[in-house]
C-alpha cells in the first residue's frame, strides 16, 4: 500500500496538485484524491511500469483497494 500511496502522490505532484496525507483502501481516486483523466492515465503508466499490471484492462478502477486487488491478482 505504501508504494501505491507514493505513486499517487508522485502523480499529484507532477501535475502541480497537493499531495494527500490520508489515503485508505476505500479512498476514491476521483472524489477523495482529486484525480482527473490525465492523472488516471499517468497512474496507469506508473503502475504498469512498476508492477506489470494494466489496472484498467478489465474496466474502470475507482478506489485504491481496486488497484491493490488488480496488483494482487497478477
Predicted feature residues:
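Phosphopantetheine-dependent thiolation modules in NRPS/PKS and related acyl-activating systems
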Residues: 1-35, 39, 50, 54-74
Amino acid at each position: 500500500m505504501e508504494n501505491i500511496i507514493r505513486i499517487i502522490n508522485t502523480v499529484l505532484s507532477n501535475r502541480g496538485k497537493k499531495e494527500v496525507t490520508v489515503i485508505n483502501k476505500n479512498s476514491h481516486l476521483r472524489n477523495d484524491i482529486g484525480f482527473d483523466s490525465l492523472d488516471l492515465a499517468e497512474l496507469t503508466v506508473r503502475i504498469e511500469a512498476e508492477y506489470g499490471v494494466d489496472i484498467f484492462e478489465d474496466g474502470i478502477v475507482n478506489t485504491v483497494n481496486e488497484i491493490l486487488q488488480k496488483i494482487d491478482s497478477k
